[in-house]
Swiss-Prot record:
This is Dihydroorotate dehydrogenase (quinone). Belongs to the dihydroorotate dehydrogenase family. Type 2 subfamily. The gene is pyrD. SUPFAM superfamilies: FMN-linked oxidoreductases. Monomer. It comes from Helicobacter pylori (strain HPAG1).
Length: 351
């Protein structure tokens, strides 16, 4: 009831203005352990059936917040209090950049979806790392999503990813290389097996922390499988599928620029993930994101082979009790099917 009133006000504002107001509050809350604990007591949820050890990291539950919400790693402590099992900060770039011109964030309310053309706006890796350290350590694993600066030419992309990773080596529990945002010109062209192989070979030399590749939902299946295979062969520990889509047919009134996320992406993301899991389940860690807004969809992705999940748009539309609701219902679904833990359910449809 309370969030419905807050949501009505926020949705009366420009989407990015509303996001900035929420972020300001979350940054303030992050500075108060007392308030964070109060939030956790209200909206957190803990159940040993949902815990899992993955790549040496302890996840209280499989539900994470996707990159893009906390671009500068400045409100992580508050966000952990809303029931997430982990968070992904960023996207951080080596140098600060403003991103694309506003307006660049839009709601498609009927479809419970968002369209963003943000363009990796962030304060840069140095300030991002400083923000991260301010309230560390955190209660859950934190990933750092890394991107390429817009002004960097393709020929120097590898050097740019090396530079941003180097700035972030002493923060975060894992790293995600973002080659799949549609909002940086030609970035998706880097989704090819040669560049991906070079990228992960380079990163493996720099860190022992887990490395992930985030892929687009608009790749042809054969291309996607080839790119993922190249990443795994070069040392990637996991794949995050998927980023936003440029398929404008999924909403009634799309804007010209930007990628779509939310419920409009559910079917497309699920289909891509199904192909990914058929080929690579048990060969790497698979993370499913895109159009997950309830326990049923979350459970389906887990049974399809997802060790971890991420949400974003659903958090905007459903509010602070979303994680708690999904996780409570997920436990019921596990119990109904006789699973003693979420770990047992991972990939059940493939066995």
């Amino acid at each position: 009831m309370l969030y419905s009133l807050v949501k009505k006000y926020l949705f009366s504002l420009d989407a990015e203005d509303a996001h900035e107001k929420v972020c300001k509050i979350l940054r303030m809350l992050s500075s108060s352990p007392f308030l964070c604990n109060l939030i956790d007591s209200q909206w957190g949820y803990k159940n040993p059936k949902l815990e899992n050890e993955i790549l040496g990291l302890h996840f209280p539950n499989p539900l994470g917040l996707a990159a893009g919400f906390d671009k500068n790693a400045s409100m992580l402590r508050a966000l952990t209090a809303f029931g997430f099992g982990y968070l992904e900060a960023g996207t951080l770039t080596n140098e600060a950049q403003m991103g694309n011109e506003r307006p660049r964030l839009f709601r498609h309310i009927e479809e419970e979806s968002l369209q963003n053309a943000m363009g990796f706006n962030n304060y840069g890796a140095v300030l991002g790392a400083r923000s991260f350290k301010r309230f560390a350590p955190y209660k859950t694993p934190i990933g750092i999503n890394l991107g390429k600066n817009k002004h960097i030419e393709q020929a120097h992309a590898l050097e740019d990813y090396k530079a941003v990773l180097n700035q972030c080596l002493n923060i975060g529990d894992y790293y995600t290389f973002n080659l799949s945002s549609p909002n940086t010109p030609n970035l998706r062209d880097l989704q090819n097996k040669a560049f991906v192989h070079e990228l992960f070979c380079m990163a493996k030399e720099m860190t022992h922390k887990p490395l992930f590749l985030k892929i687009a939902p608009d790749l042809e299946t054969d291309d996607m499988l080839e790119i993922v295979n190249s990443a795994i062969e070069a040392g990637a520990h996991g794949i995050i599928a998927t980023n936003t889509t440029i398929d404008k047919s999924l909403v009634f009134a799309p804007k010209e620029m930007g990628g779509l996320s939310g419920k409009c992406l559910t079917k497309k993301s699920r289909e891509i993930f199904k192909e990914l899991a058929k080929a690579f389940f048990n060969k790497t860690i698979l993370v499913s994101v895109g159009g997950i807004s309830g326990a049923k969809e979350a459970y389906e992705r887990i049974k399809m082979g997802a060790s971890l999940l991420q949400i974003y748009s659903a958090f905007i539309y459903n509010g602070p009790n979303l994680c708690q609701n999904i996780l409570k219902d997920l436990v019921k679904l596990l119990q109904k099917d006789g699973f003693l833990s979420v770990k047992e359910a991972i990939g059940a449809d493939l066995r």
